[in-house]
Structure formats: structure tokens, C-alpha cells
Amino acid sequence: PTYILGSLTANGRVILINQSGVIFGNGARVDVDSLIASTLNLTNQNFLNNMFSFENLGGSGSILNEGQLKAFSGGMIALVAPVISNAGTIQVDSGTAGLFAGDKVTLALDGNRLVKYTIDQGTLNALIQNNGAIKVAEGLVVLSAKGVEQVSKSVVNTGGLIAATGITEVGGKIILEGDEVTL
């Protein structure tokens, strides 16, 4: 797996892809405009065409966050894998925090803003576990898991904090999607 155990800072979009897994360890601090971390494959052609269609080519690992992931104002944090666990903090101002569990996930972006997402193909035992904190001011929080139809269920468990707040007309929005959602 890819281990982020220290600081990662960037003014632009950071994309981390490792089919063996991505781990943000306790004490990790990420400060970026936008972050996409995935254990699903993104082809070179799709990347060059700014098409973020991630697909499991077999044996995709999981994502674990025990650190602090923060996107600058208007940015995005997207974690894409069959199994995602957040025990740390994810924070975005005026943007999107999204955890997407499936075998094929497509993110449509306008700059660094998420404008649409689809889980095109479910996975066996899709799981999103949030025991940490996801904080979005004036933006969107999405936790979406999709299992293989008729074979398994997808699970979204959140024992942690999810907050989407805003002082504008739109305010904040939280979307929890899955066959089994536990708050």
C-alpha cells in the first residue's frame, strides 16, 4: 500500500492511486486544493482526457484515513475504493467530501469541483465506515456504497461526526447511499 505518514501540501489537485491500498496514518496531514485517492485503476488515456472513471481490475485494496485531510476552499476530497474507513478528519470549505465504494466509479469534475458522480458497478461487500469526522462548510458530503445486485449488500456505517453547514441559501447537504445505512 501507499502510506502517507507525514505532511502532503499542494496548490493543485493531487491524485494517489495504488491498487494495494492507500493509508493516511495517524499524524498524517494533507493540505491540498483537491485530493483523489483510489485503489481502483485510472487509465492513462482517461487521465489525459480529464475523465475520472476508476475501475477495479482485480484485487483492489482499501483506503484507511487516520490523519487530517483538508481541501482548500472550493476544493474536494474524494476517496474511491471497494472498502473505505475514516477514523481521522476530512475537512472541506465550500466544496465536496465524497467517499465512494464500488468497483467502477466515475467522477465528473469542473475544475476541482465535483459536479456529478456515479457508481457504475457495485462490488462484493462494499463498505464505508466513518468513525472520524467529516466537516464541510457550505458544501456537500457524499457517502455512497454500491454492492453487486442480488449477491451482496453495501453498507454505510457512521458512528462519527458528519457535518455540512452553511449560511448561504443553499447551505450544506449530506447524502448517505447504500443498501444498509447505520447512523
Give, region by region, the residue ranges found by the protein language model.
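Extracellular and secretory-pathway beta-repeat/beta-biased strand scaffolds
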Residues: 1-183
